[in-house]
C-alpha cells in the first residue's frame, strides 16, 4: 500500500467503500483516536478538511472515494495531485487542548526543518504528469520512516518521516504573517504559496525551474528558526506517535504520501505541522475550532504565539481577511485543480524561492500529507497576511486561486489527466480563476459567502481599487465579502494583519456552528439539489476541441516561463480572459429570470464572478455522469452578481423560479423549455469571443465532444443524462477519462456542463429556424452520428441543436438528405428509446421528409393496403377522391414530395384514408417507421398502419402485399366496388375485390419483378392467411398477417370466389360480408327473395316437400354447433380461397348475389365471382325457381327426411345462370293456360336442375379441398421434418402429439356436433303425439351428447393451450418463414377438416333434396 493509502487509512477503514453520496456517514470521529491530535498540522486545522463533503453528490468525496486510495495507489496520474494537496486532517480534534494550537511560526519552523533535513535532490519531483515521480519521491524518504522519530530527541532527526507519513495532510503553508505592527515589507523570502493561487505563487511559477528545494528549505528555516528549539522535542514525540497511528505499516506505505485520494485538495502551500516537529501541545494546534463548518483563520505571526483558543461551538473569525483564502469546500485548501497535481510545478512555493524547481515543488507537497478524509468538510480559511507578500505581488488575488475544488470537490487536477499535469501546476496560471470561478462548492449554508469570497477579482488584484464600483454588497454580495474593509488591497494589508473580518458564514445570516457539519449539510443539500436537477430540463453544453486547444495553450503558462516582474499583469490578464470566457460560455444568466437589470453584469466581463463559471455546472466526470451538474446547477448556479442586494438572496436550489407564464410555456411547449425566460432579442452569441482563447463556438464544442466521446450505446445507463438534452449531448466522454480531460481546460469542462445556459437556449432558437432548412438526419448508430459531426463544422447559426423531437419529428427525420442536415438522434418527448426503434435502413435522397408520423404511416398503410384493391397501375380513383388520386398515383421514379402527401394525410387518416390507393406497392412512398418489428422492404412494401394496428408487411413466405381488405379497415365503413374500370363505390363494411382475369393479368404485368419477388410455389398454402380474393392471392397483394395480428379479424375477411368459375353453392351463401356467419344471411338478396317465393309456391302445392323446401323450417347443423369452438368463418373463408383457385370453371356471365345488400354495391361483399358485367336488370330478371331462405344451413343430412331447404345451396353464379336459362325456357309455359300441375312440375324440374348443378359444384369443391388437404399435409410433413431437426426430442414429441391430437379433437367435435344437431332436429320435428319412449330416448341422447360435446370443448381448450406451448418452443428454433409455415399448417389443418365435413354434409343434403324432388315428380309423370 502506498503512503497515500496509509495516510487515509484512519478514515478509510470504514468509509473507503462507502457510497459517494453518503458524504459524511462513515466519518467516525471516535474511530480516529485522536489521530487529528497526532496528525493535525495545526490542531484544529484538521477540521479544515471537513468541507470535503462539498463534492457534488455524484462525485466521490475526498474521504469516501472508493478509488481514492486504491486507485491513487495505482499510480493514477490524478493521484499525484492528491499528494500535492495537503488536505488537512478531516478528523476534528475533539480532545486536543485549546492551548495546543500551532502558530504560523511553528508550521513554518517545521517546514524549514523538513526542507533542511532533506537533500534538495531527494525533493526533486518528476515533471507533472509523471506518475513514477510520485513513487520516487515517497521512496526517497522511505528509509527515514521507520522509528527514528521516536528515538531522536531532535526534531530534525525524524521530522521528515513523520511529516511525510503523517496521516494528516497539513493545511497549506501557513505563512509568516507579521503583525500589522511589524514592518510592512516581509522578508525577501516568499511564503509557501499555492503556485497558482496567489500572486506570489505565480511569481514562484515564473521561476518554477528555480533553485533546488534546498533553497526553499533554507528560506523556510529562515522564517521559522526562532521557534525551532522550543518545539523540537515535543514535536518529535507527537509526530512519531502520529506516524505510528497513521501508518501502521510505516515503511512501505510512505511511498504513497504524495498520492492523495480523489477529492483531496492539494495543500501544497502548507507543510505539515506535525511533520515540522512542532510539539503536539503547541498552542498553534488549537488555533482553529473543530467545528466542521467553522471558518478558521490563522492568526498573525505574533497572534499565533499567543493564540486565543476558540471554542468549538463559537463562530470563528479570520485573523485577517487573507485567511479567507484558505477556505476549501473539501476542508483543504484547494488550488486550481490543474495546479494541485502532485507534479505541478506550483506546488509548495515560497515567494522568495524564485529558483525553486518544479521538482522541488513537487517534493515539497509530499510533506503535506494529504488527508483523504476531511471529516466535516468545514470550510476553514487560512489566508496569509497580505503584508507578508512582496509589495510587487498584490495579495488581492490570493483569494482568487483559492480552492477550486473540481466539480466533484476534487481539485480540477483530478479531472485533468496527466496531460493537464504536463501543462504544469500552473497550467492555468490564473487557475485562481478556477479556484474563484469554480467557486467553492460548499454547502450553500456555510459557504455562500465563501463562494463569493473565493471568486477572483477582476482586472487586477485590487478588487476594490478599480472595480469597487462594480462590486457591492447589494449586487455582488460574494465578491463584496472579499473586498470589504479593503482587506485585499496591498495597501491595507498591513492594517488588517490582526483584524478579524466577520465570519464568512455570518454573512449568510448566522455564524457557523460546530453543529452545522458540512458533511450532513452538504450531503442533504446535494441530495436535494440532485433531485431537483433530475427534474429540471437542464441542458449541458459541451466544450469544443478548438477551445480546448486554444485555452490549453493559454493556460499552459510554464512556471519558469513567466518573468518575476511580469507575473501580476500576466495573472490578471488570464483572470480577465478566463472569467470572460467562462461567464460568456457558461453563464446561467437569463434575462427573464434575473430580477433586475443589475444582473446583466453591466461591468466588464472580467468582473463577473468566476464563481459563476463554477456554478455553471460541474463537468460530468467519466463514470459520474450525473454528479457534475448537480451541485453547481442547483446550488451554485447563481451568478455572483445576480442582483438582489443581500447575500442570502440566492436562487432557491440554485435557480430562480419560473413565473406562471413561463411554467405554462414550459408545460405547453416542452420542446421550448430551454427558451423559457429568454427575451427574443437577447442573444448570447455576440458575447462569444472569437479570439484564439475564446471558449469557442458550440460547433467546436460539439466537435470536441465527438472526438473525445465514445459510443453512446456503450453506457446505456447514462443515456438519460439530462432530460432537456438529446442523449448525445448529455452523454459525456465517460469512457475517455483522462484523455478527454487532458485535452480541455477547466473552463471548457464547465461550459461543457453548463446547464440551461443562455447560449444553448439561444442556439436552440436559431436551430429551430435552421432545422426547417436542414432537417436533422437520423443515424442508425452512434458511430455514424459521431463520425458525422466531423463533417459538420457549421456556424452557430446554422447549427442544429438536439432539441426535443416529438414522435412526429422522429418520423420526419432523415428523409431529406439532399441537404446536409445536422445528424441528430431525435429523442421522443415521451420515450427515450423511440429513436432506436427506427430501422437502420438507408433512405434514398429523393424521399422527402414528411410532416406527421402517424398520418404518414396511416397513409402509407392505406396506400399499400389498397394495392390489392387497385386495378391496373394506371387506374385512377373515382371522382369521389380527387385529392387522393393526386398524391397516390405518383410515378415511382419521381414521387411527389412527401411534404405534399403529408399536407393531405390528415384527411386520409379518417375513414376516407382507405380511399387513397396507389396502383402498386412501388408507388407507395417509402418511409422509415419507428416500429422495430417491421419488415422494411426495398420497395417500401412493409408498413405498420397505426390506424388499423396491424402490420402490413411482405411475408417471409409470400412476398405478397396488402390486398384491399385489412381486417380492421372494415370498421371504417369503407367498401370498394371494383369493376373492370376500377371505379370505386363507397359502401359499408369491407372491401374484397375480385378481379376479372384481364384485371389480374394486367395487374400482375404491372408488378415489377424487380420490386416484388415472384410468389413462391407454396403460395397456395399461405393463401389461407390472406384476407382477399383468390385473384389477390395471385396478384401478390394479399395481406399475409401474422397469426397474432390476424386472429381478431381472420373471421372477418370475406372470402372471394373465383371469378372464372361458378363458386360452390356452399361458398355462395358465404359470400356475404364477414360479419355474416357462413351459410347464414342477415339480409336477403333479390335472388333469395325469388327463391323463397318459388319454394313457397312448390310447398304450397306439394306439402310433402314442405320439410325440405319450407324457408321457415329451422334446423340445426353441425356447423351451428361448431360455432364458437373454431372460428368457422375464418377457416372456411380461408379454405375457400385455397379451393377457389383450384376450381377454374366455365367463365359464364358471373352474376353477383350478395346476401347483405340487394343493390349492386352488395357485389363487393361477394366472395364469389363478381362479374361487374352483369347488369342489375339481368339480376332482377333472374327467376329463382327453387330456393328457400338461406337462414337454414342444411347441416344434418338424414335428421329429418328431406328436411332441408334450398337455401342450403345459396345461389351462386352458376345457379343464377341456370335459373336465367330455365326462366327463359319456362316463361312461355308459365304464362300459358295455367296447368298448375304442369307448372309445379316445371318448377320442380328447375329446382332439380339447380340443385344438381350445385351438387356438381360442391363435388368439384370437395375435390379441390382434398387437394388442399394434401398440400397442407405435405407442408405439415416439411414442418415436422424441420422441427425434428432443430428441436429436442421431447419438444418434437410435444409437437407431434399436438398435431395428432388436433386432428382427433377436431373430428371428435365435428362428430359430436353432427350427432347432437340430428338429435335436436329430431326432437324439433316430433309429431304432436309422439310416443313417450321416442321422445324420452331422444332427450336422453341429447343429454349425453351435450355432455360429451362440453367435454370435447374442454379438450379443445386444452389443445389451444398446448398449441401456444408448442408455438413458443418452435419460435425459438424456427425461422420466421418456417414458423409462418407451421402456423399456416396448424390453422389450415383444422379449417380443412371442418370444411371437408361441411361439404360432405351439404352434398349429402343436396342429394336428399334431389331424391325428394324426383320422387315427387314420379307420381305426376305417372299421371
Swiss-Prot record:
Amino acid composition bias (Pro residues), ranges on this chain: 1054-1065
Positions of the ASD2 domain: 1092-1418
Family membership noted in the UniProt record: Belongs to the shroom family.
Organism: Rattus norvegicus (Rat)
Keyword annotations of the record: Actin-binding, Cell junction, Cell membrane, Cytoplasm, Cytoskeleton, Developmental protein, Membrane, Microtubule, Phosphoprotein, Tight junction
Record-listed Phosphothreonine modification sites: 834
GO molecular function: actin binding; actin filament binding; beta-catenin binding; protein domain specific binding
CC per GO annotation: adherens junction; apical junction complex; apical plasma membrane; bicellular tight junction; cell cortex; cell-cell junction; cortical actin cytoskeleton; cytoplasm
Subunit structure, interactors included: Interacts with F-actin.
Annotated spans, Disordered: 1-101, 116-171, 300-357, 586-630, 758-855, 872-930, 1045-1085
Keyword Cell membrane: yes
Biological processes, Gene Ontology terms: actin filament organization; cell migration; cell-cell junction maintenance; melanosome organization; negative regulation of actin filament depolymerization
Domain ASD1: 575-677
Biased composition, class Low complexity, residue ranges: 8-27, 872-885
Upper lineage: Eukaryota, Metazoa, Chordata, Craniata, Vertebrata
Name this polypeptide is given: Protein Shroom2
Residue numbers bearing the Phosphoserine modification: 103, 185, 197, 291, 806, 830-831, 833, 918, 920, 1072, 1329
Function: May be involved in endothelial cell morphology changes during cell spreading. In the retinal pigment epithelium, may regulate the biogenesis of melanosomes and promote their association with the apical cell surface by inducing gamma-tubulin redistribution.
Domain notes: The ASD1 domain mediates F-actin binding.
Cysteine pairs bridged by disulfides in the record: none
Composition skew (Polar residues), residue ranges: 28-69, 83-93, 119-130, 891-923
Compositional bias ranges of the Basic and acidic residues kind: 761-771
Subcellular location(s) of the protein: Apical cell membrane; Cell junction, Tight junction; Cytoplasm, Cytoskeleton
Chain coiled-coil ranges: none
Stored Pfam families: ASD1, ASD2
Amino acid at each position: 500500500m502506498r503512503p497515500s493509502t496509509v495516510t487515509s487509512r484512519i478514515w478509510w477503514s470504514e468509509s473507503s467503500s462507502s457510497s459517494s453520496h453518503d458524504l459524511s456517514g462513515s466519518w467516525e470521529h471516535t474511530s480516529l483516536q485522536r489521530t487529528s491530535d497526532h496528525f493535525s498540522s495545526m490542531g484544529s486545522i484538521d477540521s479544515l478538511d471537513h468541507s470535503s463533503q462539498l463534492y457534488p453528490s455524484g462525485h466521490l468525496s475526498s474521504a469516501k472515494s472508493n478509488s481514492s486510495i486504491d486507485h491513487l495507489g495505482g499510480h493514477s496520474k490524478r493521484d499525484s495531485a492528491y499528494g500535492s494537496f495537503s488536505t488537512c486532517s478531516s478528523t476534528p480534534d475533539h480532545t486536543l487542548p485549546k492551548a495546543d494550537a500551532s502558530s504560523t511560526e511553528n508550521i513554518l519552523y517545521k517546514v524549514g526543518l523538513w526542507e533542511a533535513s532533506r537533500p534538495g535532490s531527494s525533493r526533486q519531483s518528476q515533471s507533472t504528469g509523471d506518475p513514477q515521480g510520485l513513487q520516487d519521491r515517497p521512496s526517497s524518504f522511505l528509509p527515514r520512516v521507520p522509528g527514528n522519530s521516536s528515538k531522536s530527541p531532535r526534531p530534525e532527526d525524524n521530522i521528515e518521516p513523520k511529516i511525510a507519513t503523517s496521516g494528516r495532510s497539513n493545511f497549506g503553508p501557513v505563512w509568516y504573517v507579521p503583525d500589522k505592527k511589524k514592518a510592512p515589507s516581509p522578508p525577501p523570502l516568499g511564503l509557501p504559496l499555492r503556485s497558482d493561487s496567489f500572486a506570489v505563487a505565480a511569481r514562484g511559477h515564473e521561476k518554477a525551474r528555480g533553485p533546488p528545494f534546498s533553497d526553499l528549505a533554507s528560506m523556510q528555516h529562515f522564517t521559522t528558526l526562532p521557534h525551532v528549539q522550543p518545539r523540537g522535542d515535543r514535536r518529535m514525540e507527537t509526530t512519531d506517535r502520529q506516524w505510528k497511528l497513521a501508518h501502521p505499516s510505516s515503511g512501505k506505505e510512505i511511498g504513497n504520501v504524495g498520492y492523495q485520494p480523489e477529492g483531496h485538495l492539494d495543500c501544497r502551500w502548507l507543510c505539515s505541522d506535525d511533520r515540522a516537529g512542532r510539539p503536539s501541545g503547541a498552542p498553534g494546534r488549537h488555533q482553529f475550532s473543530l467545528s466542521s463548518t467553522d471558518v478558521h483563520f490563522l492568526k498573525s505571526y505574533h497572534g499565533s504565539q499567543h493564540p486565543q483558543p476558540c471554542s468549538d461551538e463559537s463562530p470563528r473569525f479570520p485573523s485577517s481577511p487573507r485567511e479567507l483564502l484558505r477556505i476549501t469546500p473539501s476542508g483543504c485548501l484547494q488550488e486550481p485543480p490543474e495546479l494541485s497535481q502532485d507534479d505541478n510545478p506550483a506546488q509548495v512555493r515560497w515567494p522568495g524561492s524564485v529558483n525553486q524547481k518544479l521538482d522541488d515543488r513537487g517534493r515539497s507537497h509530499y510533506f503535506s500529507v494529504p488527508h483523504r478524509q476531511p471529516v466535516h468538510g468545514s470550510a476553514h480559511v487560512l489566508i496569509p497576511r497580505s503584508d507578508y507578500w512582496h509589495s510587487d505581488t498584490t495579495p488581492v488575488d490570493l483569494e482568487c486561486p483559492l480552492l477550486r475544488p473540481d466539480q466533484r470537490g476534487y481539485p480540477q487536477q483530478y479531472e485533468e489527466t496527466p496531460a493537464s499535469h504536463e501543462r504544469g501546476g500552473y497550467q492555468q496560471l490564473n487557475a485562481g480563476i478556477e479556484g474563484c470561478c469554480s467557486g467553492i462548492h460548499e454547502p450553500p449554508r456555510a459557504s455562500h459567502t465563501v463562494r463569493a469570497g473565493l471568486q477572483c477579482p477582476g482586472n487586477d488584484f485590487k478588487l476594490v481599487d478599480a472595480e469597487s464600483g462594480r462590486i457591492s454588497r447589494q449586487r455582488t454580495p460574494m465578491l463584496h465579502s472579499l473586498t470589504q474593509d479593503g482587506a485585499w488591497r496591498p495597501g491595507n494589508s498591513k492594517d488588517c494583519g490582526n483584524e478579524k473580518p466577520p465570519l464568512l458564514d455570518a454573512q449568510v445570516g448566522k455564524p457557523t456552528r460546530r453543529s452545522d457539519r458540512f458533511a450532513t449539510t452538504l450531503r442533504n443539500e446535494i441530495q436535494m439539489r440532485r433531485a431537483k436537477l433530475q427534474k429540471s430540463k437542464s441542458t449541458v453544453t459541451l466544450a469544443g476541441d478548438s477551445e480546448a486547444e486554444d485555452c490549453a495553450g493559454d493556460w499552459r503558462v510554464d512556471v519558469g516561463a513567466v518573468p518575476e516582474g511580469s507575473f501580476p499583469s500576466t495573472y490578471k490578464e488570464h483572470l480577465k480572459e478566463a472569467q470572460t470566457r467562462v461567464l460568456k460560455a457558461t453563464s446561467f444568466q437569463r434575462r427573464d429570470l434575473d430580477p433586475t437589470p443589475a444582473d446583466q453584469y453591466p461591468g466588464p466581463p472580467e468582473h463577473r464572478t468566476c464563481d459563476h463559471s463554477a456554478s455553471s455546472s460541474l463537468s460530468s466526470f467519466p463514470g459520474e455522469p450525473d454528479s457534475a451538474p448537480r451541485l453547481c446547477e442547483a446550488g451554485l448556479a447563481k451568478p455572483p452578481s445576480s442582483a438582489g442586494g443581500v447575500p442570502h438572496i440566492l436562487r432557491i436550489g440554485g435557480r430562480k423560479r419560473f413565473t406562471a407564464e413561463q411554467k405554462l410555456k414550459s408545460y405547453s411547449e416542452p420542446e421550448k423549455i430551454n427558451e423559457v425566460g429568454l427575451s427574443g432579442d437577447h442573444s448570447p452569441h455576440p458575447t462569444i469571443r472569437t479570439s484564439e482563447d475564446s471558449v469557442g463556438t458550440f460547433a467546436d464544442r460539439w466537435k470536441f465532444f465527438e472526438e473525445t466521446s465514445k459510443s453512446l450505446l456503450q453506457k446505456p445507463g447514462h443515456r438519460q443524462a439530462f432530460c432537456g438534452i438529446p442523449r448525445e449531448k448529455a452523454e459525456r466522454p465517460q469512457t475517455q477519462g483522462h484523455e478527454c480531460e487532458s485535452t480541455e481546460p477547466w473552463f471548457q469542462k464547465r461550459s461543457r456542463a453548463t446547464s440551461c445556459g443562455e447560449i444553448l437556449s439561444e442556439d436552440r432558437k436559431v436551430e429551430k429556424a435552421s432545422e426547417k432548412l436542414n432537417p436533422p438526419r437520423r443515424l442508425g448508430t452512434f458511430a455514424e452520428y459521431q463520425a458525422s459531426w466531423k463533417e459538420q463544422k457549421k456556424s452557430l447559426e446554422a447549427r442544429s441543436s438536439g432539441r426535443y423531437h416529438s414522435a412526429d419529428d422522429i418520423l420526419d427525420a432523415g428523409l431529406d438528405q439532399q441537404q446536409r442536415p445536422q445528424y441528430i438522434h431525435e429523442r421522443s418527448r415521451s420515450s427515450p428509446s423511440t429513436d432506436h426503434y427506427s430501422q437502420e435502413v438507408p433512405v434514398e435522397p429523393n424521399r422527402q421528409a414528411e410532416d406527421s408520423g402517424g398520418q404518414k404511416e396511416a397513409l402509407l398503410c392505406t396506400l399499400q393496403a389498397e394495392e390489392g384493391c387497385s386495378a391496373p397501375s394506371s387506374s385512377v380513383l373515382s371522382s369521389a377522391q380527387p385529392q387522393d388520386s393526386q398524391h397516390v398515383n405518383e410515378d415511382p421514379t419521381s414521387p411527389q414530395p412527401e411534404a405534399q402527401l403529408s399536407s393531405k394525410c390528415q384527411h386520409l387518416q379518417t375513414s376516407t384514408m382507405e380511399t387513397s390507393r396507389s396502383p402498386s406497392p412501388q408507388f407507395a412512398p417509402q418511409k422509415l417507421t419507428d416500429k422495430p418489428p417491421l419488415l422494411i422492404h426495398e420497395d417500401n412494401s412493409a408498413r405498420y398502419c397505426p390506424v388499423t394496428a396491424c402490420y402490413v408487411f411482405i411475408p417471409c413466405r409470400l412476398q405478397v402485399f396488402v390486398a384491399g381488405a385489412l381486417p380492421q379497415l372494415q370498421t371504417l365503413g369503407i367498401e370498394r366496388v371494383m369493376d373492370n374500370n376500377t371505379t370505386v363505390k363507397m359502401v359499408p363494411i369491407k372491401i374484397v375485390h375480385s378481379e376479372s382475369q384481364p384485371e389480374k393479368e394486367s395487374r400482375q404485368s404491372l408488378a415489377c419483378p424487380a420490386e416484388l419477388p415472384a410468389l413462391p410455389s407454396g403460395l397456395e398454402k399461405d393463401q389461407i392467411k390472406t384476407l382477399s380474393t383468390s385473384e389477390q392471392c395471385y396478384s401478390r397483394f394479399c395481406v399475409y398477417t401474422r397469426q397474432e395480428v390476424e386472429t381478431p379479424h381472420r373471421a372477418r375477411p370475406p372470402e372471394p370466389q373465383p371469378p372464372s368459375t361458378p363458386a360452390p353453392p356452399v361458398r355462395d351463401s358465404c359470400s356475404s360480408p364477414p360479419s355474416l356467419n357462413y351459410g347464414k344471411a342477415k339480409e336477403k338478396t333479390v335472388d333469395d327473395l325469388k327463391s323463397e317465393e318459388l319454394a313457397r309456391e312448390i310447398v304450397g302445392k306439394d306439402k310433402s316437400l314442405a320439410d325440405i323446401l319450407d324457408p321457415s323450417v329451422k334446423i340445426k347443423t353441425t356447423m351451428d354447433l361448431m360455432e364458437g369452438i373454431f372460428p368457422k368463418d375464418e377457416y372456411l373463408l380461408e379454405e375457400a380461397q385455397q379451393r377457389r383457385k383450384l376450381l377454374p370453371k366455365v367463365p359464364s356471365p358471373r352474376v353477383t348475389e350478395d346476401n347483405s345488400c340487394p343493390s349492386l354495391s352488395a357485389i363487393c361483399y361477394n366472395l364469389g365471382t363478381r362479374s361487374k358485367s352483369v347488369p342489375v336488370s339481368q339480376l332482377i330478371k333472374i327467376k329463382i325457381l327453387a330456393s328457400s331462405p338461406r337462414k337454414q344451413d342444411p347441416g344434418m343430412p338424414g335428421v329429418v327426411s328431406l328436411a332441408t331447404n334450398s337455401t342450403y345451396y345459396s345461389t351462386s353464379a352458376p345457379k343464377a345462370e341456370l335459373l336465367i336459362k330455365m326462366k327463359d325456357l319456362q316463361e312461355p309455359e308459365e304464362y300459358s293456360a295455367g296447368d298448375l300441375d304442369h307448372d309445379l312440375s316445371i318448377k320442380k324440374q328447375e329446382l332439380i336442375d339447380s340443385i344438381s348443378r350445385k351438387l356438381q359444384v360442391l363435388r368439384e369443391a370437395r375435390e379441390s379441398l382434398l387437394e388442399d388437404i394434401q398440400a397442407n399435409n405435405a407442408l405439415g410433413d416439411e414442418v415436422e421434418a424441420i422441427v425434428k431437426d432443430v428441436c429436442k426430442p421431447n419438444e418434437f414429441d410435444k409437437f407431434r402429439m399436438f398435431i395428432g391430437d388436433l386432428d382427433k379433437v377436431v373430428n371428435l367435435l365435428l362428430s359430436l356436433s353432427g350427432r347432437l344437431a340430428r338429435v335436436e332436429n329430431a326432437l324439433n320435428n316430433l309429431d304432436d303425439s309422439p310416443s313417450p319412449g321416442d321422445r324420452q330416448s331422444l332427450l336422453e341422447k341429447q343429454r349425453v351428447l351435450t355432455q360429451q360435446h362440453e367435454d370435447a370443448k374442454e379438450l379443445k381448450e386444452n389443445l389451444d393451450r398446448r398449441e401456444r406451448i408448442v408455438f413458443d418452443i418452435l419460435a425459438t428454433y424456427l425461422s420466421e418463414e418456417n414458423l409462418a409455415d407451421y402456423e399456416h399448417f396448424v390453422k389450415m389443418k383444422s379449417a380443412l377438416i371442418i370444411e371437408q365435413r361441411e361439404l360432405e354434409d351439404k352434398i349429402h343434403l343436396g342429394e336428399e333434396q334431389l331424391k325428394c324432388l324426383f320422387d315427387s315428380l314420379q307420381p305426376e309423370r305417372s299421371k
